[in-house]
Amino acid sequence: MARSNLNVSGIEIANDRPFVLFGGMNVLESRELAFEVAEKYVDVCTRLGIPYVFKASFDKANRSSVNSFRGPGLEKGLQILADIKSKFGVPIISDVHEPGQAAPAAEVCDIIQLPAFLSRQTDLVVAMAKTGAVINIKKAQFLAPQEMKHIITKCEEAGNDQIILCERGTSFGYNNLVVDMLGFGIMKQMNVPVFFDVTHALQMPGGRADSAGGRRAQVTDLALAGMSQGLAGLFLEAHPDPDKARCDGPCALRLSQLEPFLERVKAVDDLVKSFKPIDTA
């Protein structure tokens, strides 16, 4: 059975514990920018007392256009992530797109992420599970919350019970996503930590013809609504200049706004978890 409480490099991850931040940037645009972003997150999270895991992708294999920027690739990308881990002393999370990437990614990353579009790909799920790493499973835009139990079972059958589920929005017609707040409770009943990816929930897939649009202006509203559900953590991407970001800039928080944004998220999380649970069933 999957675990309701996980420990990643001394960080406790559970729905009833203070929230953990999976934060960073969408894709590794450059070594220098990655270090700048990591330093800002570490400084802010240290001041606010928020447990922190750095996130960035070494390869974005699911871009809308064949001409879209994908990142430095597996080898160079993992080296950058390893260097960030060493310099800042933080755990790392990054996503895996092919079974052959799972083992090398798990050697560097404390958490490996299963992309939403690929979450039903059994060979990929099994390869990731067999690494023994903690797995963050993004809920596919086309799956109901209750269907995530089948992906958990695949991981368990492959010998891995260290599983996190992450909500990132559900398809609502064309070029739009919505977040069903009731879905958080359904996934929490599966005895796993549940996170909210507020960044990608703001996407408008294909909304800019050859790339995704987004609704950055609503990031605070949606984040506070999601964290009111009593979650294990928040997934967030930020950028010094989102309008120049090479992937998902329309959804990214401005890096300069990170501290006031997280102050609000932490206040909601602290308040919600100060209440005693009540059974209304």
Curated annotation (Swiss-Prot):
Question: Which GO terms of the molecular function aspect are on file?
Answer: 3-deoxy-8-phosphooctulonate synthase activity
Q: Which GO terms describe its biological process?
A: keto-3-deoxy-D-manno-octulosonic acid biosynthetic process
User: Where is the protein found, in the record's own terms?
Assistant: Cytoplasm
GO annotation, cellular component aspect: cytoplasm
What catalytic activity does the UniProt entry give for this protein?
A: D-arabinose 5-phosphate + phosphoenolpyruvate + H2O = 3-deoxy-alpha-D-manno-2-octulosonate-8-phosphate + phosphate
- What Gene3D superfamilies has UniProt attached to this entry? Aldolase class I
Location, primary (coarse class): cytoplasm
What EC number(s) are associated with this protein in UniProt? 2.5.1.55
Q: Does the keyword Cytoplasm apply?
A: yes
Q: What InterPro entries does this protein map onto?
A: Aldolase_TIM, DAHP1/KDSA, KDO8P_synthase
Q: What class of enzyme is it?
A: transferase
Q: Which cysteines are joined by disulfide bonds?
A: none
Keywords, comma-separated and alphabetical: Cytoplasm, Lipopolysaccharide biosynthesis, Transferase
**What's a Pfam family in this record?**
DAHP_synth_1
| Pathway(s) served | Carbohydrate biosynthesis; 3-deoxy-D-manno-octulosonate biosynthesis; 3-deoxy-D-manno-octulosonate from D-ribulose 5-phosphate: step 2/3; Bacterial outer membrane biogenesis; lipopolysaccharide biosynthesis
Question: Can you tell me which family this protein belongs to?
Answer: Belongs to the KdsA family.
PANTHER family recorded: PHOSPHO-2-DEHYDRO-3-DEOXYHEPTONATE ALDOLASE
- Quote the protein name from its UniProt record: 2-dehydro-3-deoxyphosphooctonate aldolase
Lineage here is: Bacteria, Pseudomonadati, Pseudomonadota, Gammaproteobacteria, Pseudomonadales
Give the encoding gene's name.
Answer: kdsA
